[in-house]
Amino acid sequence: MRANVLKRKLTLRIKRKKRIRAKISGCENFPRISVFKSNRTLYIQAIDDVKAVTLAAVDGRKLGVKANKEGAKKIAAEFAKTLKAKKIEQAVFDRNGYVYHGVIAALAESLRENGIRL
């Protein structure tokens, strides 16, 4: 029973992800900021969909932070520094099918506080 519930939740997240990706894309000036959330950590990257390259990425494991709101704020601050070093100040936020609440919302708000326009 539990396996079916988990499978259904994953299926619904992937469906949301596909709907979102059909509507947004990033370019060199306005990259798509994609977030992946695991049980232990967060991963965030800026993607140029036109050239299909990753412009910048931050891994929560390397920073030693957990997948909670405080960790999301630290990762976002580090990611904002990386983007500013590459002269990127505006981007499109891709929540990757996750609900815009909790950790994902804290990450986006912290990016905005650090000067990245989403």
From Swiss-Prot:
The keyword rRNA-binding applies. It comes from the Bacteria. Keywords: Ribonucleoprotein, Ribosomal protein, RNA-binding, rRNA-binding. The keyword Coiled coil does not apply. Coiled coil: none annotated. One of its GO terms (cellular component) is cytosolic large ribosomal subunit. One of its GO terms (molecular function) is 5S rRNA binding. Part of the 50S ribosomal subunit; part of the 5S rRNA/L5/L18/L25 subcomplex. Contacts the 5S and 23S rRNAs. Belongs to the universal ribosomal protein uL18 family. This is one of the proteins that bind and probably mediate the attachment of the 5S RNA into the large ribosomal subunit, where it forms part of the central protuberance. This is Large ribosomal subunit protein uL18.
